[in-house]
Amino acid sequence: MKTISKLICALAVASLTASSALPAEDIHVAKVGIDHYRGKWLEIGRTPMFLTNGCVAGYSTYSRGKTPNEVAVEDGCRLGSPRGRLKTIHGTGAIADFGAAKAKMRVRYPLFIIFNYWVRYEAPDGSWFISTTPDMSNLWIYSRQVPTKARLKQMVNKASAIGYDGRKLEFPAH
């Protein structure tokens, strides 16, 4: 319970720095199918932040929500090593552009913490994607499996191509 409380506090702090309002200028988002929001995605790369200090083997698991545009979200990681203690938090996502690209999801976590995640790129085969906050201050690379070194380089290059400084990313162990 102590770890969950720390995680909730960290999310609260992080949400103050993450954009919760959508910018006036709409930056390109990918077009994804509803299956994008099903199953487990491994967090391959991310922008460092207080919330994820000490977290490795991160993941997000999506499952069907109560309505067609709702997604049940479980975010988790292991503390210190891929075999460390599991830390999780649950939220409810709403796909904001459900009738269109299905790429903008707003997730509500406990204590009124809200994050907006926009899918900026999805690989043609659907095996990995890049998600950011609307203002691109935070970026995550997710994959269905741990990538090869060549694939990881491709992922980082794509992050740079969409306007993010790939040198800012960290790549926690899996």
Q: Which stretches of residues belong to each language-model region?
A:
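Bacterial N-terminal signal peptides that target proteins for export
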Residues: 1-8
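Bacterial N-terminal signal peptides
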Residues: 8-17
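A beta-rich soluble binding module of mature secreted/lumenal proteins
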Residues: 19-174
